Amino acid sequence: MTIVLNPGKVTLSQLEAVYWNGEVSKLHHDTHFAIKKGAERIAKIAAGSEPVYGINTGFGKLASIKIDADNVVVLQRNLILSHCCGVGVPLAENIVRLMMTLKLISLGRGASGVRLELVQLLENMLANGVIPVIPEKGSVGASGDLAPLAHMAAVMMGEGEAFFQNIRMSGIAALEKAGLCPITLEAKEGLALINGTQTSTALALAGLFRGYRALCGGLLAGALTTDALMGSTAPFHPDIHILRGHYGQIVVSETLEKLVKDSGIRAAHLRDDDRVQDPYCIRCQPQVMGACFDLLIAAAKTLIIEANAVTDNPLILSDDTVVSGGNFHAEPVAFAADQIALALCEIGSISQRRIALMVDPAVSYGLPAFLAKNAGLNSGFMIAEVTAAALMSENKQMAHPASVDSTPTSANQEDHVSMACHGARRLLAMSENLFTIIGIETLVAAQGIEYRAPLKTSSLLQSVMEYLRKNIDTLKGDRYLASDLHKAHILVSEGRLLSVLSETIFPQLKPK
């Protein structure tokens, strides 16, 4: 299925489909007029004698140097090659596809001045699976994501490297195998390709999508734990949360109520329960997870605006004037990435605390130590809980805001930068850790619920338990647990446990 992009109106669900499903995208044909008009305006300037930044001048600190019309094409080529300075391992294919899609959206607004054939080459690369090799490091998030986007642009010129049919090869070889021809960049086109926030935004969107999946997985795991610990569901009463008024808290409480509804375990201890209140990691799930959801919603609002934005420089305005500005500065993306990082950290933190409760016989309300059968001879989930603690601690360190850092670059011309790119990139590592933490909690909670037999959990949670046990057996004695943790990670990270239930049970990630 091909996603047709209408720049300015692209939705979060369309971008999710690109990231999770590898959907191919192209611009709506209505964009062609604006693209052609912008290209004509730039061509006219390039043919004239008046110096205009980015069209017939140098770049950055060298902006005052006028470039002759005969060298404009050389200027663009040199720009791309000199900026291919990325280092580190290549970004994943779905990240690069998302980057390329975001660049299409930006160019499709017609304010960048590139030719239609350049845009169509980018579309054809996506359609034919030519995926540029883009090293993950090298951008400070202003003046745009220069280095990573230069690696993308290099392939369009027949330079650099690309993956084609999962094989890494030269950029020109990948184009040829796909039946495509490299393009010679004309005035401003190189700058339009690399001046933008598309790498940072793609990484932040990936973090958002993964964070939302983790949040839903955390709600499911938290509901399982609540039943495993015979916790009270009274704190999920909707009126409590309506009185406070936070949207995330309200919808999270509704989700938790749905998940534990009709639980036989809960019904068995509605009366004569000597515990007045549960620990906060059980009782305050709506408050904590709701606040995390609100952070994700806020980040989503920022990122969908940025995804539809024109972020290169200079720009062609509606009156045909060409004006230099600073839309390439990724501060909004950096802030959004920091918000997502805080949410990922807290989702993992409260999950780890629930694991700790379940493995401790002093506070687990009758569960055996470490959920082990014949504890002592068997260690059960003792070290799985330690692993969760280690991952939680890693995430705490990575949650420190990246946006508070800045360092001058480019001979002090670019003297304040956003650090959005690595601020967004760390979300991938944080979410990987978080998927494992939630996977561990799910395993421990499922074991705990089984210890409550013959009492049964809710019908919704029972369906999740049945799916889980088709993939991972109950821990009846110590075994090689790494395999279980790996399988649990996959079930959470790929959303397989969530797919057992209707998606309407969970809060919907829709920016307000």
Swiss-Prot record:
Class in the EC hierarchy, top level: lyase
UniProt-annotated location(s): Cytoplasm
GO cellular component terms attached to this protein's record: cytoplasm
Single GO biological process annotation from the record: L-histidine catabolic process to glutamate and formate
Enzyme Commission (EC) number: 4.3.1.3
GO molecular function, one term: histidine ammonia-lyase activity
Keyword annotations from UniProtKB, A to Z: Cytoplasm, Histidine metabolism, Lyase
Family: Belongs to the PAL/histidase family.
Name listed for the protein in its UniProt record: Histidine ammonia-lyase
Species the sequence originates in: Bartonella henselae (strain ATCC 49882 / DSM 28221 / CCUG 30454 / Houston 1)
